[in-house]
Every structure is written in C-alpha cells, then in structure tokens.
Amino acid sequence: MLIPYEQLQAETLTRLIEDFVTRDGTDNGDDTPLETRVLRVRQALAKGQAFILFDPESQQCQLLAKHDVPRELLD
C-alpha cells in the first residue's frame, strides 16, 4: 500500500528519510551531507519520483523510486 508522504507527521517523515539515506549501501562512498540527501529524497517524493510503500505483513515502510513501485499500485 502506498502512503502519501503528506499524511505523515513531519518528524516521522524525517526519521524515515534519514533511516533510508543512512542505510548500508545507500551512500556508495558519497560524502554528501545528510541534510542534502534528506532534501533530495523530499524533493523526489514531492515530484512523484519516489514513494513510501507500507507492507502490512511485515509492518515495514520502504522508500522506493517510482520505477521500483509495482505498477498496479500506481494505477
């Protein structure tokens, strides 16, 4: 299920994004400051280039690029 980012509390959204951008394998040796990486994800969410996917089975949220979201969820 896709969760509109606007429906999350500001602090919750920030923590979700920070968790995503600081995970192993997401920085690829990039020394970009955390604030910049968070801003980029916020912009991608606002432009519809990224989405928050909630899996009710695992009770986990994921941030996905639009091309990684199952097509049936975008319709």
UniProtKB/Swiss-Prot annotation:
Name assigned to this protein: UPF0270 protein PputGB1_1339
Lineage summary: Bacteria, Pseudomonadati, Pseudomonadota, Gammaproteobacteria, Pseudomonadales
Family listed: Belongs to the UPF0270 family.
InterPro entries: UPF0270 (IPR010648), YehU-like_sf (IPR036685)
Signal peptide (from-to): none
Organism in which the protein naturally occurs: Pseudomonas putida (strain GB-1)
